[in-house]
């Protein structure tokens, strides 16, 4: 513990990670820990929040006690209830149901923590977003979690609004944390911040939603439970009060899992946490100031900041050597830096964990026998270590965890080696099983987006990103053909548009900013690969180690090289910074660069460019060595930098007659936005005049997630208005739209098999700029057509797929989803071929599974077209198809199209309005889309009961019922007039018994997982059947 700090009694909350069944009085959630500490340790300081003074050169500390923390959270709860339409948990049919999540995209300070605990206490799931995510990444997480709202700090608002452009999530600006702290005087302490249903049970993982990088390059949501969060509170071996108390400075962002360890220690053992200002990126110098003014006893950070502090020399090392421990994690500390710090008495503590499992290494005060190169595994969690194949003579292990609330174990992708002195407890991660690149900042990069886009080019044979433990990534590109090295510069120019396209979908820290980071390799070089044919990434890095090192040497001296003229110094500096960051010029020379959103990678690029500029234009009056890695952090505005260069102490001589000129703001760059400002989606719908399509239209416009539906309607003739045709079609089906609903519908007359879907170029452009979903429900219903007759249907689907690509190319942040309506007919013979009745939601593996009719063959062709699109264009569109079982009439209006086959011919009817609602839910599902879904009523019904209902309504007696074969004979013998069954005679003879009486059963597991309506579907009721018969009587079809 640091000197001059007094021990204060702290009563620790009783938390057991594996409580006995009968232990019901224990603390279960973080909000309950907050309430316990407010009662048991009210005056103990929970945190010190650093704030910038007005001149931004001096830090002040705001002290927050446990009582104040609880009262601030209570105030935040009130604000949330008043300003957001929160869906609080409620008891429904004996079980608790939660509402949609609320996302937090905020700067990392105590305010973020207050909002997080307030929402958790209300029972509202919290999506915690990194402030470093790109708009496409945020958009993906908002979609996948169905977040209802997003609370956004000011400087992040532009990114958030871009991300939420096509989504229903509302954007809110938070109150600063000071507002909650300044209004809590005199508030009662007995007001609970815990909603009665905020805790459901131990299996509930819809509590806090963190995120990591998924295999597609976009982040994936990670759902964690209350018990998972409590494991942070117990992540220590600080049994002595002298070790447990004192101030713990943490530069770790609170929107990452590692960042939660420090405040959890404050909650669990009373170790006061000190947060840096939320609007700044921590630097070495600022961190040393914070350690000093807070009188810190310990420090938690990432390797890159430790390395920067070590570069400061004795000043930095001595400040660290006086601490009880210095914890680092999220990346690997360079051995040379670690050794230097350890030699000078710094007590380094290696930390380890994953987003899915939480912290796996306890916080403790290292003793002399501890080796900082290894982390020590916790002994209070259920962990499983297994030895795997060695790497040469080095033993390797894999670690399996059992996350709280997760039913299955989680195997960590890192390979571990053990400390020979403590082989059962101390380990180090030496490589990942997956392809994640971990930067020097601890940030992670999934390189698949970059690599796959580059490999699309005919110039490229293979692409492998690199950058492990560096500040930015680069990419090795193996050329597809032999090219003389003298032409490499021209090739880089040709490839750069692809890199720029990839950058648009990658986070800021994961982007390539210079063509110098593209390392070209000849086509003849042998790239190391595994037995499976995949690239052996680590072997590639080793093989080209010298070349990669050369790339980073070039990057150190690369960047925009500008002259700094003392007459125009501010303007020159601003231009340099803008080129390094790609910022538009709508900012002032007095703006704090980090409050504006500069990240650590951009700060390094600016520093490099400044070194080059000083070397080129100011050598002799200012030494480049003065522009250290900390320079941008120390001088975080153009004005501050200019003042530094003008100071005589820095060796600059101002020209005679020089006078500082006032700065005139540049003109704002015009920014173009997508047309939808409220975040709702636009759907392109075909087949809206058909039975299923019309009910899909009604379902879509009733969804709060939909802004507009554009219907492509084939005109009956050159005179009929397409909108009028649609209106008459809906009315014939007893579907009536209000004026408000009609205002959401656009109707375009078209021929979808023609170029641009038969639209004008202007109309097609509108689709490119607005559509986010495509639902293709149009299809001719004729069982006599042969396969060649469906050519126009294949061309229509081709054109819609082309539109999806055009949408993505025009709006790279949008990945449109196209859903095609297929049929049970494509698997009508599945039971005969495979010997099982249940048809899985998989592709057709044999044409023998088809019903032998052109209708089924054509649907299969379209299914195969979609499978091809999913394989070859995974980053441009999402495609799926839905095989429909037998659709009945509407459950509300009784409408059942007399021209569609089999009213009353199948044993598992699903009403058309229910089917349409299920399709809408599959189309708009935030979960990753499956390729294939089935929609069918899983409830099988008795023909005997159904026929009794029909007979009663039609006043038929039992003697009127005929055996199946005899009925077929009468159908065949009767004339064609007034005999609608005659045209389906072949179907009755060949397919009805198999498809209509239970021999073909569509599996619906995937569809029911994504559709709440399909999960709730019931048998068709007697009232429903009476409605169908009544409708047919009304239109004169039944007499």
UniProtKB/Swiss-Prot annotation:
Family: Belongs to the adenylate-forming reductase family.
Residue numbers bearing the O-(pantetheine 4'-phosphoryl)serine modification: 600
Disruption phenotype: Abolishes the production of cichorine and leads to the accumulation of 3-methylorsellinic acid.
SUPFAM superfamilies to which the protein is assigned, alphabetical: Acetyl-CoA synthetase-like, NAD(P)-binding Rossmann-fold domains
Practical and industrial applications: Cichorine and its derivatives are promising in the course of developing novel herbicides.
Protein's recorded name: Adenylate-forming reductase cicB
Protein's job: Nonribosomal peptide synthase-like protein; part of the gene cluster that mediates the biosynthesis of cichorine, a phytotoxin active against knapweed, corn, and soybeans. The first step in the pathway is performed by the non-reducing polyketide synthase pkbA that condenses one acetyl-CoA starter unit with 3 malonyl-CoA units. PkbA also catalyzes one methylation step to produce 3-methylorsellinate. The nonribosomal peptide synthase-like protein cicB, the cytochrome P450 monooxygenase cicH and the O-methyltransferase cicE are involved in the conversion of 3-methylorsellinate into nidulol.
Binding site for AMP: 256, 350-351, 355, 429-432
Pfam families reported in the protein's UniProt record: AMP-binding, AMP-binding_C_3, NAD_binding_4
The protein's enzyme class: oxidoreductase
């Amino acid at each position: 513990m640091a000197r001059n700090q007094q021990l204060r009694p702290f009563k620790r909350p009783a938390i057991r990670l594996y409580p006995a069944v009968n232990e019901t009085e224990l603390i279960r959630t973080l909000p309950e820990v907050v309430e316990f500490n407010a009662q048991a340790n009210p005056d103990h300081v929970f945190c010190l929040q650093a704030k910038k003074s007005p001149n931004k050169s001096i830090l002040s500390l705001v002290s927050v006690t446990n009582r104040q923390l609880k009262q601030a959270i209570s105030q935040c709860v009130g604000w949330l209830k008043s300003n957001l339409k929160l869906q609080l948990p409620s008891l429904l049919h004996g079980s608790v149901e939660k509402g949609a999540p609320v996302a937090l995209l905020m700067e990392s300070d105590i305010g973020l923590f207050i909002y997080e605990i307030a929402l958790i206490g209300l029972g509202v799931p919290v999506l915690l977003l990194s402030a470093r995510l790109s708009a496409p990444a945020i958009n993906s997480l908002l979609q996948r979690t169905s977040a209802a709202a997003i609370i956004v700090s000011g400087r992040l608002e532009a990114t958030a609004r871009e991300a939420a452009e096509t989504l229903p999530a509302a954007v809110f600006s938070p109150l600063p944390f000071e507002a909650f702290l300044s209004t809590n005087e005199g508030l009662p302490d007995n007001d609970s911040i815990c909603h009665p249903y905020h805790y459901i049970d131990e299996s509930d993982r819809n509590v806090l939603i963190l995120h990591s990088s998924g295999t597609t390059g976009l982040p994936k949501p990670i759902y964690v439970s209350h018990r998972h969060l409590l494991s942070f509170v117990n992540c220590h071996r600080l049994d002595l009060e002298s070790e447990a108390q004192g101030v713990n400075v943490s530069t770790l962002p609170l929107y990452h899992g590692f960042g939660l360890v420090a405040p959890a220690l404050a909650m669990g053992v009373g170790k006061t946490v000190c947060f840096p200002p939320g609007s700044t990126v921590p630097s070495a110098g600022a961190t040393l100031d914070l350690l000093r003014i807070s009188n810190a006893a310990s420090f938690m950070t990432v390797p890159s900041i430790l390395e920067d502090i070590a570069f400061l020399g004795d000043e930095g090392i001595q400040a660290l050597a006086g601490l009880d421990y210095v914890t680092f994690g999220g990346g690997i500390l360079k051995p040379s830096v670690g050794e230097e710090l350890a030699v000078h008495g710094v007590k380094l503590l290696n930390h380890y964990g994953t987003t899915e499992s939480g912290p796996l290494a306890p916080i403790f005060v290292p003793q002399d026998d501890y080796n900082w190169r290894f982390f020590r595994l916790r002994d209070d969690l259920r962990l499983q270590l297994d030895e795997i194949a060695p790497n040469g003579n080095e033993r390797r292990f894999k670690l399996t965890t059992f996350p709280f609330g997760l039913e299955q174990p989680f195997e960590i992708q890192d390979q571990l080696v053990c400390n020979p002195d403590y082989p059962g407890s101390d380990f180090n991660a030496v490589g990942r099983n997956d392809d994640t690149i971990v930067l020097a900042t601890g940030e992670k990069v999934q390189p698949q987006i970059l690599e796959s886009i580059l490999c699309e080019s005919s110039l490229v044979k293979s692409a492998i990103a690199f950058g492990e433990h560096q500040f930015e990534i680069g990419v090795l590109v193996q050329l597809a053909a032999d090219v003389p090295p003298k032409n490499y510069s021209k090739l880089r120019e040709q490839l750069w548009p692809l890199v720029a396209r990839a950058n648009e979908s990658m986070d800021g820290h994961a982007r390539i900013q210079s063509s110098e980071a593209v390392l070209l390799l000849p086509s003849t070089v042998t790239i190391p690969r595994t037995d499976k044919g995949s690239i052996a990434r680590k072997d590639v890095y080793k093989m080209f180690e010298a070349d990669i090192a050369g790339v980073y040497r070039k990057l150190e001296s690369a960047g925009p090289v500008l002259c700094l003229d003392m007459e125009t110094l501010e303007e020159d500096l601003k231009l340099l910074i803008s080129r390094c960051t790609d910022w538009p010029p709508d900012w002032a020379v007095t703006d704090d660069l980090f409050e504006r959103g500069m990240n650590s990678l951009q700060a390094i690029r600016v520093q490099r460019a400044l070194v080059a500029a000083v070397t080129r234009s100011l050598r002799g009056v200012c030494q480049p060595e003065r522009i250290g890695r900390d320079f941008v952090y120390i001088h975080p505005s153009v004005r501050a930098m200019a003042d530094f260069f003008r100071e005589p102490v820095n060796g600059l001589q101002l020209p005679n007659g020089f006078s500082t000129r006032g700065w005139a703001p540049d003109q704002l760059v015009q920014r173009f936005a997508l047309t939808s400002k409220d975040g709702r989606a636009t759907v392109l719908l075909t087949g809206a005049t058909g039975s299923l399509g019309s009910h899909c239209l009604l379902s879509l416009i009733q969804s709060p997630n939909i802004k507009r539906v554009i219907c492509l309607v084939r005109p009956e003739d050159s005179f009929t208005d397409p909108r009028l045709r649609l209106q008459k079609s809906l009315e014939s089906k007893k579907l009536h739209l209000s004026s408000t609903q009609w205002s959401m519908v656009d109707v375009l007359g078209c021929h979808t098999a023609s170029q641009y879907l038969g639209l004008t170029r202007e109309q097609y452009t509108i689709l490119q700029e607005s559509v986010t979903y495509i639902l293709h429900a149009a299809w001719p219903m004729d069982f006599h057509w042969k396969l060649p007759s469906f050519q126009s249907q294949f061309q229509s689907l081709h054109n819609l797929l082309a539109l999806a690509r055009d949408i993505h190319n025009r709006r790279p942040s949008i990945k449109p989803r196209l859903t095609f309506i297929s049929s049970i007919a494509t698997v009508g013979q599945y039971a005969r071929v495979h010997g099982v009745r249940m048809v899985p939601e998989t592709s057709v593996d044999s044409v023998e599974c088809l019903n032998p009719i052109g209708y089924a063959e054509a649907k299969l062709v379209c299914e195969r077209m979609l499978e091809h699109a999913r394989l070859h264009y995974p980053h441009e569109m999402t495609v799926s198809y839905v095989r429909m079982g037998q659709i009945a009439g509407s459950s509300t209006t009784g409408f059942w199209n007399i021209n569609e086959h089999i009213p009353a011919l199948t044993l598992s009817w699903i009403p058309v309005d229910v089917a349409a609602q299920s399709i809408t839910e599959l189309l708009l599902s935030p979960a990753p889309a499956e390729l294939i879904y089935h929609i069918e009523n899983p409830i099988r019904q008795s023909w005997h009961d159904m026929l009794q209902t029909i007979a009663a309504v039609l006043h038929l007696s039992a003697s009127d019922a005929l055996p199946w074969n005899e009925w077929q004979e009468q159908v065949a013998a009767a004339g064609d007039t007034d005999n609608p069954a005659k045209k389906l005679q072949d179907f009755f003879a060949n397919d009805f018994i198999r498809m209509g009486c239970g021999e073909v059963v569509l599996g619906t597991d995937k569809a029911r997982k994504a559709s709440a309506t399909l999960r709730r579907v019931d048998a068709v009721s007697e009232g429903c059947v009476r409605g169908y018969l009544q409708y047919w009587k009304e239109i004169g079809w039944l007499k």
